[in-house]
Structure formats: C-alpha cells, structure tokens
A protein has these predicted regions:
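Flexible, acidic/Gly-rich N-terminal and inter-domain linker regions that tether
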Residues: 1-78
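Conserved Radical SAM active-site core
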Residues: 67-168
Length: 168
C-alpha cells in the first residue's frame, strides 16, 4: 500500500516528474496511480534571460492562460517571484500588469507549478508573491500554497523564506 505522505515526499522533497520515479511504491500501485493521475508539471513555454542572471519564465495555467514568473539569482540566495492572478484589478501606477485587465485567480496548483516546474527549483532560497496579481485578492489560494510550501508533508520551508507583497 502507499500513503499520501509517501507521494507528497516524492513530489515535494525529491521533485519527481513522473509517478514511475516513486520507487518505494510497488510497481502495481504506481501503475494504478499513473492510470488515474499525473503529477501535473507544466513546463515554461518561454524564458527570457537577462545579463544579471535573472530569468523571466512564461508558464501556462490549467485553463490555457499564461503568467510570468521571475527567477532572481544573487550571490548567496535565489529568489522566485511568483504570480497569483492572470492580470490584476488593482491598476497600480508602478505596475504594468493592471493594463492587461483581470482574467482570473490562479489556483494553488497553478501557483505551485511555477515553483515545481522551475528548472532551478533546487537552488531556491526564497519565494515572493510579487508577480502578476494582488495576493490579498486571491487569499484562499495563497494560503493553500503557503501551507504546502511550509508543511512537513510539503516542501517544509521556513515561513521566513516566503514573502507576500501586497498593495493593501
């Protein structure tokens, strides 16, 4: 038999991309899982590299829209700015996202995909909710995401490594 804890550990600790990589689950149970589920990793469809090492990725969402995610490497840290909405309702003067209009909230799965599918995932030291969208306008999915990022069954990150940036 297998447990949710085993599956979560493979996904969030070992970052497997295929169910077959979960080697402490029997082949029979892996086959059953693979028939019913996929891990759901959506690779970035575009990446723009800057001279300072920053990389802006374009990730697809579950409903065929796209969001930007920015990876920022520094000397002793690597930060990921994740999006929580497609577009934004706030229309802040300093931000171009509001000019796109608002198309919807990202699910926790869409937000986590930006982390999980990042080629540099093993280098990350910090995550900032400061991409497209206003986190407080999508609070339920922000809370689900931060729970998985900080829970023992998830990524087990310290909450100090996660920042939620808000206009309000």
């Amino acid at each position: 038999a297998f447990t949710g804890g085993q599956i979560a550990k493979w996904m969030y600790t070992h970052h497997v991309k295929q169910i077959d990589e979960m080697t402490n689950i029997s082949k029979n149970n892996r086959a059953k899982l693979a028939e019913a589920y996929t891990i759901g990793c959506n690779e970035a469809i575009d990446a723009q590299h800057s001279k300072d090492g920053t990389i802006k990725y374009l990730f697809p969402t579950h409903d065929g829209k796209f969001v930007e995610t920015v990876y920022i490497p520094e000397n002793d840290r690597a930060t990921l700015c994740v999006s929580c909405q497609v577009g934004c309702k706030m229309n802040c003067l300093f931000c171009q996202t509001g000019n796109q209009g608002f198309e919807g909230n990202l699910t926790a799965t869409d937000i986590l995909n930006q982390v999980y599918s990042l080629p540099e995932v093993d280098k990350l030291t910090n995550i900032v909710f400061m991409g497209q969208g206003e986190p407080m306008d999508n609070l339920d999915n922000i809370l689900r995401t931060t729970e998985i990022l900080t829970a023992d069954y998830g990524w087990a990150w310290s909450p100090k490594r996660i920042t939620v940036s808000s206009v309000g």
